[in-house]
Amino acid sequence: MTKDFLFEIGVEEMPAHVVSKSVKQLADRTGKFLKENGLGFKEIKTYSTPRRLTVLVKELDEKQADVDEVKKGPAKKIAQDADGNWTKAAVGFARGQGMSADDIYFEELKGVEYAYVHVQKAGKEAKEILLGLDEVIKAMTFPTKMRWDSQDFEFVRPIHWLVALYGSEVVPVEFLDITAGRKTAGHRFLGDSVVLANADDYVEALRDQYVIVDADERKAMIVSQINDLVNSHNWQIKLDASLLEEVNNLVEYPTVFAGSFDQKYLEIPDEVLITSMKDNQRYFEVYDQEGKLINCFISVRNGNKDHLENVISGNEKVLVARLDDAVFFYDEDRKYPISHFVDRMDSVSFHDKIGSMAEKMTRVRIIGDYLAKRFGLSAEEVADFDRVSGLYKFDLVTQMVGEFAELQGVMGMHYACLAGENENVSVAIKEHYMPTTAEGDLPKTKVGALLSVADKLDTIIAFFGAGMIPSSSNDPYALRRYAYGIVRILLNEDWSLPFDQVVPEIVELLSGKTPAKLPQGAEEDKQLADFIRDRIKQFLQKNNYQYDVIDAVLASSEQDPSQILAAAKVLQQHHDDEAFKPVVESLTRIANILKKAKFSQASPVDPSLFEDRSEQDLYDGVEALANVKDHAELYEAFVALQGVIDRYFDVNMIMAKDEAVKNNRLSQLAAVNDLAKRLGDLSKLVIK
């Protein structure tokens, strides 16, 4: 027999961002607890609001299965001494099964007598086992925790009640000074407490008390109400998923409403308005049918429609106060030229151990000018880069960014545009922060992409030079994200940048031109280059490349992300082709022969030492590949050459007795292997 089991932890209001993760954690830990205690169940449903974390275990077994099994122990000669007395090994074996040594008997197995016990144990009742759920509560972890009253225990918020019902029966789980019962709390202002008769009454009983405990249902209500409101006014809305999730976890009974503000505030940049509404007030911004921001917002109340006009008025007043501040900052900042803010960069610290923002901008210009030549930017683009690299951090000391830090770069773009800077310069100020998240949008302009790469590369070089290198578990300055951003931009722009070559050259360029400490020596340069290169794996994984393809291309000595990606594309594309297996096997055979022969000093191949036409054919084939740059073309050439390679092995003894012939043939194979290594370490490919 089975019954449903309800377990609710009632708390003070939790921060919205922890609710979903916390209820998932509760479900995972509860499921683990039940499995470890031998209780089967169909599934675990989760319910959550800011005031409760709940699991409903469907079809939970009433008891553990009875145990009736034979356990094998040590051999008889170990279980008993010469006088027939039980040894410690025997006593320990029996005790481990909940038995005594007197319960041991012996049976022969393959000519050897072993100790056995027959274990028979009645399974425990589910109600008895569930009393141990206090351990689940104790095991839960949170980003921040609180203590309350005189308790020494910490939880995400103080716990005020517990509900534990197995079917209709209370399971009196005890935690601190609380004993679980069948009484739960309705909405803080609209509902009353509820006495649950049965675990399955939970959802509907709380609905009657203005609590929608199903987070998915609550979210659907919000979306439906928003759509009704938007359609009735002929508006448009960008339904931000993360904001919707946050708002959903702020309410127990959602009611959507719209508010408005004076049109004069539309004169400030859209991003300021959106930040004020979305980030500060948790409002959804509203657009007209042409996609233009209008002076309205949508929000969600934790309650019903009673006195909704007062709620709307209160929210409008709060937003207007915020917007008045924004207008003041905007007007104050525009009183000064950009040079006024740039002059203050000397007093803005990038990092105590590295130097000022002014010094950083100087380094970034040097790096960017070097990269611009490699990337082939036009003279106009280089001029725009030189201009923007001398001012791009200026908005950090504006009043607007001082109040709205999330607008750094954005306000710089707007202020630069107002000051008459061209579009390339203005937009690059915003784009140099991109991508702002691991998979965020990339710069759309060449100048912005160059500035972003140069700025991120400088940051990584500076922190490595100062000895602040990320560990496997700690990256406080997000250097891995910066490195991944560099890789994504390079690949998006199809810019070639072999890190092993570029890093030492940049460090040399910066030497003597900055007070910041730089990486010292080839070993530190390599460590830094490898750190950035390692982010290519993240890119390939994100783009669903097969694990063996990733292993193969990253095992090569290639440092240029564009070349590594090109190789990965070819191997991925042809991985399941009929020709792939024989080609890879032939090339891998060559690599293995060279490795076994410990052959590393290849000499130019001497055709005069050839003894068979197959050697000349392979020589001609390799010569034809010497100038092939495209990886796809290289692979196709290997497919065409595969028969030649096989004939070469069929006819020729590689390890010939004649030393000159042997070395010549190994040199031939080394020439093939050098070309194959452009595709990666093919031995790591899994071929069938």
From Swiss-Prot:
Claim: Transferase is one of the keywords in the record: no
This enzyme's EC code(s): 6.1.1.14
Any GO MF annotation of the entry: glycine-tRNA ligase activity
Localization per record: Cytoplasm
Pfam families xrefs: tRNA_synt_2f (PF02092)
Record-linked HAMAP family: Gly_tRNA_synth_beta (MF_00255)
Quaternary structure, from the entry: Tetramer of two alpha and two beta subunits.
Protein name listed in UniProt: Glycine--tRNA ligase beta subunit
Designated gene of the protein: glyS
